[in-house]
Amino acid sequence: MLFTAHQIQTIREQALGMDKHRQVTPEVLATIYDHRLFHLFVPDELEGRMTSLPEAARIFQESARIDGNLGWLVTIGAGGGFFASLMSREVSRRVFAHREAVIAGSGMPTGTARQVDGGFIVNGSWKYCSGSTYATTFTANAVIEPGFTVQDATGELTADQNQSLIRSFILNPGQIEILEDWNAFGLRATASHTISAVNAFVPFEMTFSLTETQGYENETIYQYPFLPFAQVSFAGVAAGIAEHFLEAAESLATQRGGSSHVVGKLEERKAALEQSVSDFYESVEGSWEELLRNGELSNATEAEITARSITAAQTALSCGQQVFPLLGLSAAMEDAEINRCWRDLQTACSHALLRSF
């Protein structure tokens, strides 16, 4: 187990306050920093703690089992380390090589970039940027305005006349305005706000392409396809929140002298979740072994990872959907632990990558 009993107790004691005030506490952030959880996919030489995907998914699950906000923030923050291989080594060191380094941002290309001498002028807004209030760096995707050129990883200019080119831009907090609009009913403390940039100048070296590796090519995690990587990460969170939900439901049912129907449904959902999570990790570990062996994943393996991730998340979601209505009015109170778990579970499983449609 990664977290100590004292850390788990502290986080859970602060969970209600985080939910009410919609922000993570300094103590919880300090725990994340102490364990270097935002650096699970950052090379060791950049003060990272490079971790295999199967191990990281279990860390995400363990974090989310303690508290949904913790699990989500750890997962999103760690995921930003994936970009270390897409930046130059000098820029990667600048971005990642300190204790509190963490990226927030968005993959949606809802900004524009106009080329100027030495770089780009970036404008736009990007939704759902988890961790926005404590991020040390922001990344955002923007469409290069037609008729301009961009530099590739070799420094050569590449024409962009006939198609929209999307590029990723590295911005510092001083270039970003945070619009505090994350009013979701779950994962309230994740600060998943909209960010905006107005006429922000970004030098060429502070941009990157999601398809061009610039360093750390030998790190296995950077060879893992990004879509299944993200799905595995989010599925781990969903599983952890569902486990916490079932724990809280069992405790509540025991206090209320739950009927055999409620107890039976709890046991049924626990068994279904355990089987689904077991199948999920079997596939994740198999894919990691395949990557180590072959240097790439087959299309069939990628499809299997996607399917197993979605199934695990949907099974996790079903725990809330099938058990929550059986728990009575006490579960409907927003300050109840079970209510918070239920809301977090619904919110996490609403992510587009965890849906089958």
Residues of each region from the PLM?
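C-terminal helix-coil-helix/basic helical segment that borders enzyme active sites and/or dimer interfaces
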Residues: R12, L16-D19, Q275-T311, F324-A332
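Glycine-rich phosphate/cofactor-binding loops in nucleotide/flavin-utilizing enzymes
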Residues: P325-F357
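Generic structural signal for well-ordered, non-transmembrane alpha-helical segments
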Residues: G240, E267-E274, T306, I310-L317, ...
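Amphipathic, well-ordered alpha-helical segments in soluble domains
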Residues: Q7-T10, I241, F245-A248, A272, ...
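Charged/polar positions within long, soluble alpha-helices
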Residues: W72, E247, S251, S278-W288, ...
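FAD-binding subdomain of flavoenzyme oxidoreductases
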Residues: G119-N199
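Glycine-rich beta->alpha junctions and the first turn(s) of the following alpha-helix
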Residues: A184-E274
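Glycine-rich flavin
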Residues: P26-D34, F38-A135, T149-L157, Q161
